[in-house]
Amino acid sequence: MRLLAMILSLAVSLAMSAGLSAAEKFKALIVDGQNNHNWKATTPLLQKHLADSGLFIVEIATSPPKGGDMQAFKPDFAAHQVVVSNYNGEDWSPATQAALVDFVRSGGGLVIVHAADNAFGKWAEYNRMIGLGGWGGRSEKSGPYLRFRDGKIVRDTSAGRGGSHGKQHAFEVIVRDPQHPVTAGLPTNWMHAPDELYDRLRGPAENIDVLATAYSDPATGGTGEHEPMLLTISYGQGRVFHTTLGHSPEAMKSVDFIVTYQRGTQWAASGKVLDASVPSDFPGRDKPSVRE
């Protein structure tokens, strides 16, 4: 059954690819080079997932290693429709920071994957772009927590650290905005493969839409709160899709990660989701679904 699902998904992707010329595909740039996670293993998956959709031409910009000359790191953001950050490391040069801000503010797309929301804790505009972040010196001074309580998202301004997680485990993701193009047509809830469940993220949380949450269970070291998992943020004329999922290569092979990442990157690039198909191996509430 899983093999059939993969074949059908590939057939849809090939059909989409056949219908688009190279000039019509979105140009995506994945940024990596430093991370406290295994970016050398996860960037190829992020590239593959986009390429498999048939909708993207993907390039990679790799920064110098820690301690290297960051002044020389000058990705050409403007040559692309969307930038995917798999980066969590040393500060970029002021010129490169300004180039990303200008790119997104002028209508470009940005995708934040997992630990990319740990980066640049002191960079004010980055924190506005990503909405919420963790670690990097973040605290109540960075902005509120967002929690889903009593049927709505609330802003919790209580004092405390920014960013934590319990033990890796499989958990249920619950859609909170089923009308958004990224989540439209997906099940209202599903099981995600074992992953870090980020909690206590905080930040400016301006122009933000929480698409999905997960319960951070105290039994696994969590907060006892329903925490944001999938977010969108409007920044100037640009669009940001922020997924807190994807700690490991295994987590990035979870079908729900693949589908929401593909959809979120389409939306960030264009404001639309061109391929809103739901593969037959998309997980339900009973167990995760992982592709090999």
Spans of features found by a protein language model:
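A glycine-rich, often tryptophan-bearing local segment used as a flexible ligand/cofactor-contacting loop or short
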Residues: 90-181
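Bacterial N-terminal signal peptides
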Residues: 5-17
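Boundary at the C-terminal end of the N-terminal hydrophobic targeting segment
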Residues: 17-23
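Catalytic beta-strand/loop cores that center a nucleophilic Ser/Cys/Thr
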Residues: 51, 57, 147-236, 278
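Structural detector of well-ordered beta-strand residues that form the stable sheet scaffold
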Residues: 107-111, 211, 241
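Helical hinge/lid and interdomain linker segments adjacent to catalytic or ligand-binding clefts
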Residues: 23-120
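Extracellular ligand-binding/catalytic regions of CAZymes and related secreted enzymes
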Residues: 23-26, 41, 52, 75, ...
